[in-house]
Design a protein with these regions (language model features):
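Loop-centered beta-sheet repeat module
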Residues: 212-221, 225-230
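Short, solvent-exposed positions on alpha-helices
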Residues: 321-324, 337
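Terminal disorder- and signal-encoded targeting elements
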Residues: 1-158, 162-167, 172, 179-203, ...
C-alpha cells in the first residue's frame, strides 16, 4: 500500500466567459461545460473503440493520440489539434493516478499513448517497464520549465541519463487559516502542533488531511526529518516513524478532525467549523476567486510538499514521437495558461504569465522561483519501511 495522494485539488473553474480574460474562445474550449463534453467525447473512444492500440492512424492520414488524464486537459485539445497538423486527441478523463497505473499495468498501455499521473506514480510506471524515455529532440520546451522541476525530474525519475516524464502543472500543500480570528505570524508547522504558537485558542479548531501521504510528511518536516524527504522515495527509519506516530497522536486533542480535500474542505471552512486547516493551495485560490478574502494560505518555513502532474508516453505506443509532440504542446505558454485557468494550478512553464491577466497571475500564474526552492516533492515510501509506514498511520487513526 504505497501512498497515493490522488485527493489533491482538481477544481474546475466555472467562472462565466465574461470573467475568463486572457484566453480567447476561438483558441480554446470555453467553459466547464464544453470541457466536459470534449472530455467525455474522448472517453467514449479512449481505447480505440474496437480494442485497437493507441495512436491509431486514420484513413485520412490523421494520427489519433489516446490520452488518459485529468478532465481539465480538454481545455487544450482544440488548440493542440489546430497547431499539430494531422493530429487528433482522444482524451479519457480520470480522477486517480492509481487508476491510470492500474489500467496500464493490466494491459491498457497498448490502448493509450499518454498518461498524466502525479509525479509520485511515475517510478511505478518505470519499474513496470511501461514508459518510454523522453525524446529531448521533440520536447524542446523542457528547458523553459522552472529549474526546480527540472531538478525534480533528475531526482525522481531519471535512469541512466534518461528522463521518463515531463512535469506539466503543479501545486503544493501548506496550511490555510481564517485571518479574521488568527493573527499574522511566521508560517510554520508549529501552528499545527504547538499550543501557544499564535495568540488564538485553536483547541478543536485545526483539521488535518485524512491521508498518510500528506499528514505524515507534515509531521516529519515539523520534526526536522527533511533528509528522509530528499531522495527519490521517503526513507524514514522505524524510529522516525515511531516519533511521527507519537506526535500525531499527541496532536489529536487539538483537532476538529481529519478531512478530505476540495469541496468538503471548502464547505467546512466557510461554515467556520475550523480556523486552521492543513490544505493545498488550490482550495484557497478557489475560495479567494469566489470572494472569500479572509482565507490565507501559507507555505511553512520548514518546507512545503509539492505535487506535479507528469506526462509519460507508453513504451507500447506506435506513435511515440507524435505523443511527445503533444506533450511538448502541454507546456507552451498558451496551452499552459489555458490549463492553469481551468484548474487553478500553475504551469511548470513560467512564461504562461505572458498569456494571463495580472489578476490571473496572482492566482495561478508565474511563481517566484525562490518559493519553489523550499519545496519537497510528493513521493512514495521506500519499500523496506512501507509496512511500518502503513502501521504508523493506522495506529494514529485508531488512537
Amino acid at each position: 500500500m504505497a501512498s497515493d495522494p490522488d485527493n489533491r485539488s482538481h477544481v474546475t473553474n466555472n467562472q462565466s466567459n465574461a470573467t475568463r480574460r486572457g484566453v480567447s474562445r476561438r483558441q480554446y474550449i470555453a467553459g466547464a461545460g464544453a470541457a466536459g463534453v470534449a472530455a467525455f467525447a474522448g472517453c467514449s473512444g479512449g481505447d480505440g473503440g474496437d480494442g485497437s492500440d493507441g495512436g491509431s492512424m486514420g484513413g485520412d492520414g490523421t494520427t489519433t493520440i489516446n490520452i488518459i488524464t485529468w478532465e481539465e486537459y480538454a481545455e487544450m485539445q482544440e488548440n493542440i489539434e489546430s497547431t499539430l497538423d494531422g493530429v487528433e486527441l482522444n482524451i479519457t478523463p480520470s480522477t486517480s493516478s492509481t487508476e491510470m497505473f492500474s489500467q496500464w499495468s493490466s494491459g491498457q498501455d497498448e490502448q493509450y499513448d499518454i498518461a498524466v499521473p502525479n509525479n509520485n506514480l511515475v517510478p511505478r510506471f518505470m519499474d513496470a517497464d511501461l514508459v518510454a524515455p523522453v525524446n529531448n529532440d521533440v520536447v524542446n520546451n523542457f528547458g523553459s520549465m522552472y529549474d526546480r522541476f527540472q531538478s525534480f525530474v533528475d531526482n525522481q525519475f531519471t535512469e541512466s541519463g534518461n528522463a521518463y516524464g515531463v512535469p506539466i502543472r503543479f501545486g503544493w500543500y501548506g496550511y490555510s487559516y481564517d485571518s479574521r480570528s488568527v493573527p499574522d505570524h511566521e508560517p510554520s508547522y508549529d501552528i499545527l502542533f504547538e499550543d501557544d504558537y499564535v495568540d488564538a485558542d485553536l483547541d478543536g479548531e485545526i483539521i488535518m488531511y485524512d491521508e498518510a501521504a500528506k499528514s505524515i510528511p507534515a509531521a516529519a518536516l515539523y520534526l526536522g526529518m527533511d533528509d528522509a524527504m530528499s531522495g527519490a522515495r521517503m526513507t524514514f527509519t522505524e524510529d522516525q516513524l515511531s516519533e511521527i506516530q507519537e506526535l500525531l497522536i499527541q496532536q489529536k486533542p487539538r483537532l476538529q478532525g481529519y478531512i478530505a480535500p476540495d469541496p468538503t474542505f471548502i464547505q467546512e471552512f466557510r461554515q467556520a467549523n475550523f480556523l486552521v486547516g492543513h490544505s493545498g493551495r488550490n482550495e484557497t485560490v478557489q475560495m479567494r476567486s469566489e470572494g472569500d478574502d479572509w482565507v490565507e494560505f501559507v507555505a511553512p518555513r520548514e518546507g512545503a510538499l509539492a505535487w506535479y502532474e507528469t506526462a509519460v508516453v507508453s513504451a507500447a505506443s506506435d506513435n511515440k514521437e507524435t505523443a511527445w509532440e503533444v506533450i511538448n504542446e502541454f507546456i507552451t505558454p498558451q496551452n499552459g495558461a489555458a490549463l492553469a485557468e481551468a484548474g487553478f494550478s500553475p504551469s511548470t512553464n513560467p512564461n504562461v504569465a505572458d498569456k494571463l491577466t495580472e489578476e490571473q497571475n496572482e492566482l495561478y500564474g508565474r511563481i517566484d522561483p525562490s518559493r519553489l526552492e523550499g519545496m519537497y516533492s510528493l513521493k512514495d515510501i521506500a519499500s523496506d519501511v512501507e509496512e511500518a509506514y502503513v502501521s504508523t498511520w493506522e495506529e494514529v487513526k485508531a488512537a
